[in-house]
Amino acid sequence: MKNYNWATLGCGVIANELATALKSRGQKLYTVANRTHEKAVAFAEKYGIEKVYNDIDELFKDENVDIIYISTPHNTHIKYLRKALAAGKHVLCEKSITLNSDELDEAISLAEKNHVVLAEAMTIFHMPIYKALLEKVNSGDLGELRLIQMNFGSYKEYNMNNRFFNRNLAGGAMLDIGVYALSFVRMFMSSCPNDVLSQVKYAETGVDEQASILLKNKEEEMATVILSLHAKQPKRGTISFDKGYVEIFEYPRGMEAKITYTADGHCETISAGQTKDALLYEVEDMEKAIEGDTALMHLDYTKDVMKIMTDIRKSWGMKYPEEE
């Protein structure tokens, strides 16, 4: 496999994890760009990166850059996706990949036109535990899927200027944490939900602070999702089948699942992967996708989840400034 040159656009928490992931496999980031140049310089010094751009646009023009990881705020993604994809760069973009389905469709068209790989950096699609669970499900040992229950609650202080509650930075529970729960649901459901109901509680800024979502697909598999940015919940999911149920702990970067079988109540534990290596798994799958195994990135699931989120926000009448 080719030794790909990775670049990061953004130098926050995720960019630090990306640099660490590459270091663990004997690599380092080729370059870094950031909206604040001084932060990019400090990031480069921390990780021994030799190249820093004075202007972000220089990143897209650099012929040596193969893959760009975009980790800027949600509402800036489409702007950078347009430039990166048009320049022929492969892109792994932090969730949520775009604000809505129209933006995502545009980005996908650009990727196809320029023959590059575009993917959302959704850890659930790449963590070994979920791949192992899919194998278990597909084996038929658990029978038919009945119900999925997902909870994701964080407790963020009511600082209306931070990105979580800031409408101008595309804040809100749906795009920040809902995307994880809905990606999990889509990964295990037989088809995309076509019957969706929801309720929402708004923060003072007008973004969704809390939401509950009910989903059902044509197979009549069902799911419930509860989200909150101001009420802590355990990051726990349950997948119920007719022969047993699976409990997932500390998703989306889980390492362990417990299966309880209905017939006799006996339990089985499945362990796979390491939480700390979440970005490493994304990097490995992205490079394999560029080599030809594009199914690893599950762009079809990303499209389905984005449509669900877009339709839900439309039903709420909730728009971001870029959508008005």
Regions found by a protein language model. Give the residues of each.
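N-terminal Rossmann-like dinucleotide-binding module
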Residues: 1-47, 322
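Beta-loop-alpha module in the N-terminal Rossmann-like domain of NAD(P)-dependent dehydrogenases
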Residues: 18, 36, 47-110
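Hydrophobic residues in well-ordered beta-strands that form the structural core
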Residues: 53, 93, 118-120, 248
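Active-site loop of classical SDR/Rossmann-like NAD(P)-dependent oxidoreductases
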Residues: 271-284, 297
